[in-house]
Amino acid sequence: NHVNFTVRKGEILGVAGVEGNGQAELVSMITGMMPLDQGDVTIEDISIKEKTIRQIRTELLSYIPQDRLTYGVVSGTDIRNNLIPFLTERKEYRNGILMKTKALKKLADEVAKDYSVKCDSSEQYVGMLSGGNMQKVVAARELSDRTRKIPPLIVADQPSRGIDIGATTFIHRKLLELRDAGCGVLLISADLNEILELSDSVIVLYDGEISGYFPDTRKLTERELGQYMLGVKR
């Protein structure tokens, strides 16, 4: 509802809030999956209105979705095919109209190892993986400079939901590395610990509006943040 904020380069901006207060709609609009009725989303001064969803995902942002089974992976195919959608135009992986399968398998095996995906090989079906390893496949595709050109914005929507502490720690570390490399990171989470641990600054969504903004999280407490999330403070 008329929200306005900026994600700066080299910053993790956390979006806190009880679920159902506009987070899903916000993410859908930023990623181009929901059309904008009014206003705009610009990434490095480029309006997403001028881009297709594919162009947004290829050129402007990486996206780790909350629902990895619906939006993050194709569970009925192998790890390799889930890692390569951004590589289909690269000449080093093409032979005319055909893809170089051996080169892609080698890359996928190496990236899976880099991201500590526990699997037999990149030919294993994603649907056979644990939730944590499935999330690592999503992270490898979206966050590795070997599988894509890293865009200026990373959108991480509940990135640790339903995964073990090892996978959570791994993905958190990757987000921090990308922030330190100069990317802007938009972190949406209902987990107060995750928000406070990772975010440099925080906005709170309540009833579709920004109820609080904290430019520096170093002195922000769970209690204070929770009051804004519940609408006690605005």
Language-model region placement:
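Glycine-rich phosphate-binding loops of nucleotide-dependent enzymes
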Residues: 1-234
